[in-house]
Amino acid sequence: MNKKSFNKRSRLLFKHFTRKNYALFNCLGREVLIGMLSVSTLSNAKANGICVKTELTGDSLQRKEVRLDEVIVSGSRAPLAALQSPVIVEVITREDIQRAEASSVNDILKLATGVDVRQRGGFGVQTDISINGGTFDQITILLNGTNISNPQTGHNASDFPVSVNDIERIEILEGASSRILGNAAFNGAINIVTKQSYPSASGSSTPQLSSYIELEGGSYGTLTAGAGTNVLAGNFSNYLSGGYTRSDGGTENSDFEKGRIFYKGGWNDNRQNRFRLDYQLGASTQSYGANTFYSAKYNNQYEKTEHLMASLGGTVNLGTDDRGIQLKPAIYYNHFNDHYQLIRHEEGAAKGENYHWLDILGASFNANINWLMGKSSIGADISKETIWSTAYGADQPEETWKEIKGTERRLSRKASRTNTNLFAEHNILLRHWTISAGLLYYINNLDEGKTAEKAAVTHHHTSTLSPGLDISYRPTQSWKICLSWNKAVRTPTYTDLYTSNVAQQGDPSLKPEENSMFKISALYKTNRAEFTVSSFYSHGRNMIDWVYETEESRRYHALNIGKLDNMGVSLNSKLQLHEDAKSAFPFQPMTVRLGYSYIHQSHKTDQPIYRSLYALEYLRHKLTVQLDQHIWNRLSLSWSVRWQQRMNGFHPYWKIDGKLQWKAENLTLYLKGDNLTAHRYYDIGAVKQPGLWIMAGGIFQIRLKR
């Protein structure tokens, strides 16, 4: 599908052998379509002759890059391949991840031009992730298409139960995406897709097993251990991984411990491909010294978070690919625990200690219909959020309070929300065009239950409509031009509504944020090069931020700060300079990636604002350069250089990372360095980042087939 066609040939449908002397001449200059082959003919055909064989070598630099044109990406409600998608979805591949100096998912996202990663701690501890000048509460995080975002606060959205070794690819959808993924995708979405192999169509019951073990250690007493295994047996696939990381931290009061476990399973009917089940279960926990994470006045903060997630989904295919219906029901569950101490080891509400328990139970259904006029999709996603807390929500009757293990304190406050997302979308697929139009009808019900002051239910109801239109034009298979307009609405988080302490004050009367975004982008792609340019304009109303209203303010207040317009442009390029590492000269560049983004912001408000904590501290400039080099034989070197300038008083900085890697068939050894120049820099407020951080380790792989 990647070859260009200049002279369209006439087609001849082959059904059987005529055994005539002139038959072969009828085929000259014509495209022959094989309509029927007998069983005896197929039995004499070798697999090597009818399929493309891909040889996997030990060094990832020696593997030819697989084009992603036919990978289904999250750019629309209906399942569309990247080539047909009406938008450009940035995809970070497994090869990109393996070469990067990355210890966490957050480190990988730093290399994406349109993504802003504001790090408080190392190895993905407490990281704010945003897209296109937005804030950390304005994106949706998905794991294999399941929403794992935290509606309490986006600060904890990066508590992933997976490691970089578990990931097949990461999809980044920039811009307002509510009509595709729900109201939380206010400014974009990130979908993490994990590794998993499905049983072959032959239905062989021969078990297959592949496993890995990883150990690494380095600066500041950092130690990581992890393992994973993938088992195929009959119609079932199973992937299980786990890991543990600990460190003394690179700065004062930044020590941490992290643990995770993840399982993903699947079942399909092999030959028929009519039905498939996917199920996953994951858990992560981390405890860390929070330094000055939330207030520069307190440098001895502490936090512990826990995340449990589970989902079960099915895919039912009825009819044919051209004229058929695909049904996708799913249920999912997320549980979050958050224990925060303003002063480490100091307990009690008066000392700023709080506990939060959050449960999210949801169900979704999507129907994709392929018919004469295109691909239509209708669906719904309904979820119930319930938070019990010592600080968030309304006071509850004492007999309903929840016990907290290990302390005499109890969860005495509660709030719950029911989120209903109703979707409709239609896609028109033409030879050179894809036109996708859709809308989201969102209903939010906030219920504070029977409060302690009155035996009544405090109830708030809002509903909004978010339409959108995406158009792509493909003049050739190398070019793609996209134009889109989408609206989105986001409800405040529980932190926005209810926080009340010596450093912050929320506001229960906050209005939902509104956003309207226009975007135009272009992609040029060949086997050796890829170039992307895009520009966007977003118009936001009732935007939420934490601010000092006057110079005398001592607490940040959650506030609707008025209108906020973001205008930006980004450029990305990737050049494959040399395909075969075996024939390359020592230190010869193999792949070069270059990215740059620029954002200008315009703010209008009637509210007095002295200082902004998040929304006005956007990245104006971001430049990324990545270089992969072949050194000798199985030895390779990868560099990453990043320069960025943040507004609202931050100094611009350069950061250089590197990874030296030796890779054999079953063993990988590496040495990686973060912040090689030991540059002093800040991503958030007064939270100082570590200097030079060196890690060394290895990954051992086992592959068995019985």
Where are these regions (language model features)?
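Gram-negative outer-membrane beta-barrel transporters
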Residues: L429-I435, N444, F536-H539, H557-Q645, ...
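Outer-membrane beta-barrel signature, preferentially recognizing the C-terminal barrel domain
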Residues: T292-T320, H356-L358, L411-R417, V457-R474, ...
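Short, acidic, small-residue-rich periplasmic hinge/interaction motif at the N-terminus
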Residues: G49-Q98, N106, F136
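Short acidic/polar hinge/loop motifs at secondary-structure boundaries
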Residues: D128, N147-A176, V193, Y263
